[in-house]
UniProtKB/Swiss-Prot annotation:
Heteromultimer; disulfide-linked. This is Snaclec stejaggregin-B subunit beta-2. Gene3D superfamilies: Mannose-Binding Protein A, subunit A. Coiled coil: none annotated. It holds the Pfam family Lectin_C. Belongs to the snaclec family. It is found in: Secreted. Disulfide bonds join C53-C142, C119-C134. GO terms for molecular function: toxin activity.
Length: 146
């Protein structure tokens, strides 16, 4: 009987330790490299899209990219839903006219500027970035750390 309790307790400890290492994001979000992402088809201006993202989950913002691989992952989620449409990303000079920064405060490490150069959209098929008036409306992608 003591052996049964010992084995049962051991299995319980293993189960509980593994249960916290699984998906820690909502089921309607996608994950990549410890972050969660969700494409929203509803069109909003940049400021409203950012505000909407902050209301979806703690520390959620419009998407920021640290690498081309992350941008490719987001494109793989946006293109099937939006085809060739543009989406708002978190890069903009809304709060700081001289320095572009991501809306979540991270520094700009990766960029994919088009030949054009206010608020920034990303083309869902090839990750090219385009400036657009912040008052225009586009679909958008939100991101938070899992």
């Amino acid at each position: 009987m003591g052996r049964f309790i010992f084995v049962s307790f051991g299995l319980l400890v293993v189960f509980l330790s593994l249960s916290g290492s699984g998906a820690d994001w909502p089921s309607d979000w996608s994950s990549y490299d410890l972050y969660c992402y969700r494409v929203f088809q509803e069109k909003k201006n940049w400021e409203d899209a950012e505000k909407f993202c902050t209301q979806q989950h703690t520390d959620s913002h419009l998407v920021s990219f640290d690498s081309s691989e992350e941008a490719d992952f987001v494109a793989s989620k946006t293109f099937p839903v939006l085809n060739y449409d543009l989406v708002w990303i978190g890069l903009g000079s809304v709060w700081n006219a001289c320095k572009l920064q991501w809306s979540d405060g991270t520094e700009l490490k990766y960029n994919a500027w088009s030949a054009e150069s206010e608020c920034i959209t990303s083309k869902s098929i090839d990750n090219q970035w385009f400036t657009r008036s912040c008052s225009q409306t586009y679909p958008f992608v939100c991101k938070f750390q899992a």
